[in-house]
Amino acid sequence: MLANAIAALLLGSGIASAAGHGSPLTSKAGHRAVIPDWDLKSSSDVSKDLGGLSKPGVDTSSWYHAGTSRCTIMGCLINAGVYNDEELWYSDNLNHVNWGQFSVPWVYRHEFALSPAKGKHFLLQTNGITSKADLFFNGKQIADKEYQSGAYAGRTYDITNLAAKKNALLVQVYPTDYLYDFALGYVDWNPYPSDNGSGIWRDITIKETGSVSMGPVSVLVDIDVPVEKNPARVTVRAEAQNLESHAVEFNAAAVISGNSCSGEALKQTIKLAPGEKKLVQFTQTIKTPSIWWPKQWGDQPLYTAEVTFSVKGAVSDTAQTKFGVRKVTSFVNQFNDTQYSVNGHPFQVIGGGYGADMFLRWDSERFTRIVEYMLDMHQNTIRLEGKMEHPELYEICDEYGLMVMPGWECCDKWEAWAYNDELAIFPPPVWDANDYETANYSMIHEAAMMQPHPSVLTFLVGSDFWPNDEAVVLYANALKNAGWQTPIIASASKRGFPALLGPGGMKMDGPYDWVPPNYWYDVEPSEDRLGAAFGFGSELGAGVGTPELSSLRRFLNQSDLDDLWKNPNKNLFHMSTNASSFYNRKIYNQGLWKRYGAPTSLDDYLLKAQMMDYEATRAQYEGFGALWTASRPATGVIYWMLNNAWPSLHWNQFDYYLHPAGSYFGTKVGSRIEHVAYNYQKKEIWVINHSLYQTGSRNIKVELIDMNGKQIAKKLVQVRTKANSGFKAMDISSDINKLSSVAFLRLVLSDEKGSVLSRNVYWVTKTIDELNWDESTWYYTPVSKFVDYTPLNTLATAQVSVTTSGGKHLPGIPGSQTRTVTLENKSSVPAVFIRLTLVDSKGNDVNPVSWSDNYVTLWPHEKLQLEVGGWDGSGDKIQISGKNIKATTVKL
């Protein structure tokens, strides 16, 4: 290892990007600047004299040029125009990329100017290189691949003695092997990227300081419950390091600003011996703090902490961070299930598992849209399994009020424990001393990055398997030293746990492939009911997420499209990897064929798929919501998955192009803040309330009609809702059991003033899908007898009119273009599963888009108003289709 490497990464704020050699990259002490772009080339095509290549003035005109500060090799090549992701995604084109070119190291290079002078120091900071690299600066090697190892192991190098007016940085990145390197793998989520994610996927920065440098700023907030009535004790910390060979005295100052803060500086004078490091901390009490809440529960006020180190009256280093006042705790209940609490209130985790872009490209605007989609679906948490992304992610979640559940990933080097018998190789490549060091610095870096953010709910130091005792001590110490204050969870499964942390309290028993809606309510006996709605399900779902035709045509050719409905058991490239259990839609399609009937066309298949997807996600979230306060509570649910790394045929709540379809709106309905739901298993009506304070009298209107529109039953019941709970309101089994065919069940929840809080329509029969629990696998439970929804194929045609008018700009319907869409069923039969799509003047989908509701079913002669928000203002028409209506298009 190289002696000039500083052990801890210096994180801070105020990062700027500068380009060109004319002006210095950094301008003053405390300034951090990003290396703005890269020239890159395969090591097989450049000189072996890397030291020489790292000197200024080398001709790189024949190299690829990537105009971005962070990119894997493939990401860089796409940026440089060598590849186009629309072409890569199409059909099986990804399989035809020359993977061999990535079997050798690649070289990244950038030249920049600095202004060295006496008293100035320059620090080079890596934040994420996948997965190992040699670093050269101005002709000298400053790190080797043994030291700069691990995708998350940020390191800091003092380059002061090498800095000149003209400088060159060269990074040689080595090929990544997920089983042997600490990287960002995709397991069975999708095909692997051609380069296995190798490259500079996070920014490299140059920081200018004076004699004393500053480490990451952390903020510890201590507050008692009830948080609304207590002061907050805030401690701001940062490590100071003397970079000189002589003692230095410096002044440290911190300013905390925000509501109820005076803004006065807290000051200290400190003396450091040569090279000495010391933790500097300041404490202030905020008497009446503004509390940060998850979005569904309140506002997201943020405070700012700014720390400055000065030597002889001049700034030596400075940084600031935002933070929030909130309190997160957890406990493992009597059933060995983890339950979280936020600000003293039981917090049911409702969310999805995030998928990073296949080539690890970050887009803040796109992620913001994803967060807004999640909040529109009434989700409160996003799980990051080994995909911790960038500081911007946490800043966005802080601002929007979405909780984040980060942690290490499964199934590769991160979990290469002697007791892990589920890796792709055996015996596992267990960690050596260098691996433990890499893991340690990975945790140090990530803990420092995430610590101040109020959106961070927890950290999972394991996913499928728990870390061994040596690793867990490293992880726990790194988190503790960073000032970590939220729960540390051993793993996302119940396979085992380290004594230091205790049980993780999360289950990972599937399903990952299709199961029927009643699965979630079939909770007894719980020891045999796997993923049903009890406990904390860390990753589970019916595997649905079928894109609509407009999206499918962007990545499938005609033969691929035909396979969807003509070859239901065929392996499909746009599913999982070719070695996984999820490489086809066989299980899903069996359910579709048996329940809805063999499709007669691609359009028919896709409509039936959207009905399958809608009922699947709705039932999952309703089941967990209804049983949140059951005798064995359903404490958390993470749908597998939220989104995909590329255009995929499954495992998403909206597709790669941000088009929301059946799985999205099933989730949105099933997760409503106040909701009324049908328990398929017991044929009961349940009331769900995810709010903190919304209570009082509620009316539930229950109506059951047959396929001809004839009323079978009608009931009105009044209940008193309970905040943050789910409870049974009534039993309708006697009505359901009388059915002779498919019927429609409409549930409407209203408040005392008659305002509709939730409207929900089901297609039901007197039977339910019969699950064969004894034959369950780790990824699904088979169905021994399917319900029969094929009578839906004989529905009489309904006539529906569609009109549009100026929008109401309802909360939750963002966009520059908001309209009201009024649907009216002018028939005596129900209009079933009406889908609406906002398109532009050319007929292309407008994405992202917000709908107050979609895929709706109308009673005979019912009128329903929906709101639509077109985000970019390009909406021109609305396309309407459904199970038993004629497809039409109306002008917006």
Curated annotation (Swiss-Prot):
Induction record: By growth on GlcN or GlcNAc.
Glycosylation sites: N196, N336, N440, N557, N578, N689, N825
InterPro entries membership: Beta-gal/glucu_dom_sf (IPR036156), Beta-mannosidase-like_N2 (IPR054593), EBDG/EBM (IPR043534), Galactose-bd-like_sf (IPR008979), Glyco_hydro_2_Ig-like (IPR006102), Glycoside_hydrolase_SF (IPR017853), Ig-like_fold (IPR013783), Ig_GlcNase (IPR041351)
Free-text function comment from the UniProt entry: Hydrolyzes chitosan and chitooligosaccharides with retention of anomeric configuration. Has no activity against beta-D-galactoside, beta-D-glucuronide, beta-D-mannoside, chitin, glycol chitosan, cellulose, N,N'-diacetylchitibiose and pNP-GlcNAc.
Reactions that this protein is recorded to catalyse: Hydrolysis of chitosan or chitosan oligosaccharides to remove successive D-glucosamine residues from the non-reducing termini
Signal sequence bounds: 1-18
GO CC, any one term: extracellular region
Name of this chain's protein: Exo-beta-D-glucosaminidase
Subunit field text: Monomer.
Subcellular location: Secreted, Extracellular space
Temperature-related behavior of activity: Optimum temperature is 50 degrees Celsius. Stable below 50 degrees Celsius.
Family membership: Belongs to the glycosyl hydrolase 2 family.
Alphabetic keyword roster: Carbohydrate metabolism, Chitin degradation, Glycoprotein, Glycosidase, Hydrolase, Polysaccharide degradation, Secreted, Signal
Activity sensitivity to pH: Optimum pH is 4.0. Stable between pH 6.0 and 9.0.
One Gene Ontology MF term: exo-1,4-beta-D-glucosaminidase activity
Active site: D464, E539
This enzyme's EC code(s): 3.2.1.165
Gene Ontology BP annotations: chitin catabolic process; polysaccharide catabolic process
Chain residues in the propeptide: 19-28
